[in-house]
Amino acid sequence: MEQPYSLEGRTALVTGASRGIGRSIALALGKAGAAVACVARGLDQVESAAAEIESAGGRARAYRVDVTRGEQIGAAVRHAEAALGPIDILVNNAGITLEKKTVEVSDEDWDAVLATNLTAMFRCVRAVAPGMIARGRGKVINVGSMYGRLGVPRYAAYCASKAAVDGLTRSLAAEWARHGIQVNCLAPGYMNTDIPRAAMAVPETRERLLSKIPARRLGEPAEAAALAVYLASPASDFMTGQTVYLDGGQTIAW
C-alpha cells in the first residue's frame, strides 16, 4: 500500500471545527491532503480554521451551521460538495456537555444534549451516506468519549448520549461495510482543551484528575488528530465498528 495515510483527492466535512479537538482534526486532515469543509456555530473561528488550512496550501471552506437544525446540515453538505467535491470523510465532532444532579436535569437540558451529541450526528451521517454508498467508499469518524463507557455521577445525559454514539457506530458499520464504508468512534479522555485546562489550574482538581489517568497527563488535541487521520485513511480500510479510547489508560485502570 503506497502512502497509506495520504488523503489526497479526498474531501472531508468536520463538525465542531472551530476549536479544540475538532479544529485540530480539520487542520490535520488538510495537512494530509484532504479538502476540508469546516463546520461550526461560530463563523469567525471556523473561518480561521479554514484560512489556516488554505495558508498551508490546502483547500477549505467554512460554514456556519447549527447541527441541531437538520435543514442547515443538508445545506452545508450541498454547498461543501459543490465547492470541494463529494464528501468522502465525515467527522462528527460537534457536541456539548452538562454537569448537573440528575434530579435537577430538565427535559430541556436532556433534549439539548441528545439533540447535539446524538441526533445531529445521525442527521449528518444520513446526509452524506447516499453519496458514499453510490461511490462505494467512505469514512465516518464519530467522536465519542470515555464517558460513554464510564459511570460518572452528575453526567447522566452526557454519558447516555456518548454510549448511544457507540451503538450508532456499530450499527452503521455493520450495515455499510459491504459498501466500502468504514465507521469508527474516536473516544477521547481528558484532553488539553479549554474545560480540562481550566480545571487543571486548581491544584486539588489537578491531582484528582491525574490520579485517575495511568499516563499522568492530559491528552493533546494533536494526538486525537493523528488518530483521526489514520481512521480517515486507506490504512484503516479493514477496521470498522470500533471504539478507540484515547485516554492515557483511564478506562482500563483499576
State where each predicted segment sits.
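Conserved glycine-rich cofactor-binding loop
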Residues: T11, S18-R19
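Active-site helix of classical SDR
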Residues: V125, S161, T169
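Residue(s) in the substrate-gating loop at a strand-loop-helix junction
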Residues: S145
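Conserved glycine-rich Rossmann-like NAD(P)H-binding loop of the short-chain dehydrogenase/reductase
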Residues: A34-S48
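Alpha-helical segment proximal to the catalytic Tyr-Lys
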Residues: P130, A174-R178, D237
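Substrate-binding pocket helix/loop in short-chain dehydrogenase/reductase
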Residues: K101-T102, S106-L114, L209
